[in-house]
């Protein structure tokens, strides 16, 4: 579906006009939103807009790397949106021209809907297509923050483990969180490069007077990027701590088993020695031989147990 919004000379909003009528009419600027378009609607990118085939191809191939392409009559942006609840990545393509902005997305966009709502309730005279671009990027980046904060909370819970989950369950959660951070990093870093390029480029003349606004977005992206990196390091630290604890726990178990085996070695030797079928073994003929052997074996076992306990091998 294509949603159109055009601002006439009297700063009045006209909605859902045909694109051809908007482009041929006397409007200050327009916003044309391609919301999950069908094939016939996609054709309008070719005509009447006449966008470059490479830009249209990028729109149709979802989840391209975020970037900016400069053309003679427009600038093309590929940006990534993240759903704060599901962390699902989606692509928002933006065409920015002299008197128009076109947005293209394959799924419903909460950023686009939020900016549309802002535009309809604020003073339209203060808005241009460049304002729409800024608001889209600002909303898009702001939606990254809840994701980072949720991940931080998850890491804190994994670290404290209040529900006493098993080591295997904790490591599964930790690796899942690390994967989320990696996905977030693959989104934030290219977006940061895009905004930095916008701030330092002179190819979009109208943005030169709005650098402080885009610098604010860039600062937000820097903060998010730093949070992502610090949380990735934290996942590594937590993982190493768990693995170290698990290794230490395994070593303690092996130590106890080794001590038990060591205690039983002389006992097994005595049992094996007197279990041999030799006729000439005088001790076997003595009526107290059996009890003496039991006493010796018990003394050896108790003595070795006391020795190892004093050395702290059973702690």
Predicted regions and their residues:
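Peripheral, non-transmembrane regulatory/ligand-interaction domains of membrane transport proteins
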Residues: 1-207, 213-216, 220-223, 227, ...
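Hydrophobic alpha-helical transmembrane segments and their immediately adjacent juxtamembrane loops
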Residues: 50, 219-315
């Amino acid at each position: 579906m294509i949603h159109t919004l055009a601002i006439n000379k009297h700063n009045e909003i006209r909605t859902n006009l045909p694109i051809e009528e908007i482009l041929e009419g006397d409007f200050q600027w327009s916003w044309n939103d391609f919301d999950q378009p069908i094939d016939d609607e996609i054709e309008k990118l070719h005509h009447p807009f006449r966008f470059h085939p490479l830009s249209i191809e990028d729109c149709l191939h979802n989840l391209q790397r975020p970037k900016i392409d400069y053309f003679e009559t427009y600038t093309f942006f590929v940006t990534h949106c993240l759903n704060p609840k599901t962390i699902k990545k989606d692509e928002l393509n933006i065409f920015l021209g002299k008197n128009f902005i076109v947005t293209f997305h394959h799924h419903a966009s909460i950023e686009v809907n939020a900016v549309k709502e802002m535009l309809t309730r604020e003073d339209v005279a203060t808005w241009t297509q460049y304002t729409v671009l800024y608001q889209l990027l600002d909303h898009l980046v702001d939606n990254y923050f809840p994701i980072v904060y949720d991940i931080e909370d998850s890491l804190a819970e994994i670290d404290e483990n209040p529900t006493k989950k098993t080591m295997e369950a904790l490591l599964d959660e930790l690796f899942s969180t690390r994967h989320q951070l990696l996905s977030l990093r693959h989104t934030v870093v290219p977006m940061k490069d895009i905004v930095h390029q916008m701030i330092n480029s002179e190819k979009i003349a109208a943005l030169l007077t709005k650098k402080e606004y885009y610098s604010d977005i860039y600062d937000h992206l820097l903060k998010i990027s730093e949070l992502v990196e610090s949380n990735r390091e934290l996942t590594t630290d937590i993982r190493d701590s768990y693995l170290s604890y698990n290794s230490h726990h395994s070593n303690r178990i092996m130590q106890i088993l080794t001590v038990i085996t060591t205690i039983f070695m002389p006992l097994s030797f005595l049992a094996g020695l007197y279990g041999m079928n030799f006729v000439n073994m005088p001790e076997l003929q003595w009526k107290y031989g059996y009890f003496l052997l039991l006493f010796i074996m018990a003394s050896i076992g108790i003595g070795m147990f006391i020795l190892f306990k004093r050395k702290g091998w059973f702690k």
